[in-house]
């Protein structure tokens, strides 16, 4: 209350339109002027007040301005402790600027300020966000030297780091080193396995956690229900549903866990159960609506998905990029070409959302399935980012369906460049030649596969890939 009250005083003194510069200079006045009617602040209180000022920032630009003021005031040099550095880093992370957070950490190290048990988890998170796993491993060495390895926040951070890097043995090693591990470490290992598509292992870890006597929280349940959805195990889904009900509390909003149940049942093919949960929810957010739309689309319920999207807009809920992946996927499954084009254009024109690879993949897939291969090619050529193998694969699938040799020969080199080890493109190209009775070319492709020693991948087709 003291700090929030002082911030209010800093705002009301003087002009109405007080900006952060005015606040900062008044703060220095309160600290440095002994004749002030306000009791001068101690360095510790001043740092806490600056931390409060940072936490109240509503934009990245404001964080940068306050950081600049703090830097120019030389406060960080006068009081070389990690507290204020940590709060600056935390503010950058909160405003999705991990590179700035890392730069602050490097500045702290150059200033010979030792990181504390709160510093490292922030920088680990930043390193994970930009996939700088080399920096992450260096931070692990720092944690070992400073004796922070057993700290629960450092521990969970390193588990997440190694999982993201695909180094699951190292993640498990960090996890196993502490027999008194906390819930955060369990959540990190379960979440890491889930994101890596190792659903069975994630569920096994969840069972082990329950046996250890720890109760799951909403983060645990979101990860394990996602793993269950990946497995499509309805029996397990029912058991996890019970766990979610047990994990809910009156004090805590249950919207995250209920959204995870909608997603889980959708992936298990039970949209009736997903719909029941959705209808019973006291509160819904964009994730709730998007999970329903994506679920309907994945299960081939095109009309239901689009009706859900209509209702979402009617309720005034602003769609996000994931919402449009579901909407466009529904159009693909329903063969609704014109509607798909309209929704694709709507992303930018109505909601100022820049389409990503998944959205471009959907529209290319939609056009290719309809035989509009030239228009699909035009979309690919005009993409603002480099097409990935799935986008090329959708176009190649259309070539196979309609026997377009010229287009298939144009697409094939791009796919081979991206995945030279994959035989899928060769198989589809051979199929296109076979459809046109070009048997010499079919044989040429087969010989090329032998020459390049391309691995045979059974039952794989780019054309069947969905988003």
Curated annotation (Swiss-Prot):
Keywords, sorted A to Z: Mitochondrion, Repeat, Transit peptide
Family per similarity comment: Belongs to the PPR family. PCMP-E subfamily.
Top-level taxon of the source organism: Eukaryota
Any single GO BP term: RNA modification
Region named Type E motif: 391-466
Name recorded for this polypeptide: Pentatricopeptide repeat-containing protein At1g77170, mitochondrial
Keyword Transit peptide included in the entry's annotation: yes
GO terms of molecular function: RNA binding
Source organism per UniProt: Arabidopsis thaliana
Transmembrane residue ranges: none
Subcellular location: Mitochondrion
